[in-house]
């Protein structure tokens, strides 16, 4: 791999701008296809930085990480090399909504990401600030490369922008304001102006981070312990165990004094003082938002999460803030265990530009400028996992475009990645978008535990899955198929089942194992006696067999719904349809269709305000006129 201090070719297939989570996945995915790829970033040393919380996964988010891993992405492998505290959220609930979450040693996570990138063939890393795009001349412009601040021109067939919070980024800490995408790092102004010139729909969003605390100043013994699961469960199917020591967190909480300090200083908050206008994430509110929105709540939990095994920095999860530094210190000192807390770095809010994701095709290519792909917070999302998922798909499609291949997409029935991109490109955002399992209509099928069975074969065909990944998956997939076949064919009579303590109706009908397994943990143990071959199964295969058995009836129903969705999504709509020529459409629907230009009948059906009658009229029109792309 070429680095910034080695000679690099002037021409690439794909250039990725930005070294955050979206950029790393995009660059690696493009390179895995064989595309000659360059990752351009301000500082190579910050590649893979965890800018906010030191954790990966969670409810919905953990599903995305498993899907990224199934497509041979970086995130799952990196967190397995950095995990110091693991929990399976919602473990007491059904497998469909369980969310793996791991806290990371920040330094080890960043090192793991950089190590993977440094050993990825076809990938170069270039230090520099991209200030402009190179485009072709003519009426239908296409991207042809980028221009760096120092004057260098890099040509490429496709470019992926993953600018994160750097696009005209401004940091706020109380009354203090500084132009930056991250503390101490300059924002991207030139690219923002370039996007302005394309007349795209754009807006401002914000996110925030809490103050970091010196671990040595916390009274740990006064606080309840929050233990993780040990042994932790790996995210990546390439890993069987995690070797790092596991540590506990501690739990503090806000008090009545904390809330009064916040109320007394709301006017000094960047958000409530009117110093920024961007909308923040609904599901990750600042402590100011919590106090204002929930005035009857007397306390809010704060999880004290160490940022590393040999790091004195602690991340107080739950008190993101843009209050002045001295107010942050006062509110910390009003909380149990933190009376003497020393702030290493104050919290702050960052406001940045984003592009309305309805300007994108499902491939994440910009409709207005072919060859330019966007991924991550520039599309209005929040979170490492959402960024990484978009980055992988954008990098894959950018590479395919450079190679003269058609784009590939995942639909809502295939993956949470498909749900994410469909929500963005169909509905747009009014606030930072975060993934939840509740956003999917097919969550019984789209589980974190079966991501590889859903996606690795698809990824292999698309060109982003390596030989190593494929070999590992193929062996597991064969074992799983063999177990499912045997479980469907191997039967026992009611009498045989009764002999091992399993009660079923005595109707003489033989029961296959698949109809019995997974419904009752105690019964599953008895099944070992009736079906001795279960003892020899790999633990993961056994677990999957139990889940498939428990969900078998529901899965068949979801499969029918999936086929209906896929049928609508295969009817593609041309960019050149004249919706004014379609009778039976209201003015509101016609205007939305003309503006948003949905790429398929399925996407049109999910537009706000769409009616069955209008959808039928569009379907009839395109079938009659054969207006397919």
UniProtKB/Swiss-Prot annotation:
Keyword Cytoplasm set for record: yes
Binding site for FAD: 18-23, 130, 188, 377
Coiled-coil annotated residue ranges, if any: none
Main location group: cytoplasm
Protein name: tRNA uridine 5-carboxymethylaminomethyl modification enzyme MnmG
Biological processes per GO annotation: tRNA methylation; tRNA wobble uridine modification
GO molecular function, one term: flavin adenine dinucleotide binding
GO CC terms of this entry: cytosol
InterPro entries the record matches: FAD/NAD-bd_sf, GIDA_C_N, MnmG, MnmG-rel, MnmG-rel_CS, MnmG_C, MnmG_C_subdom, MnmG_C_subdom_sf
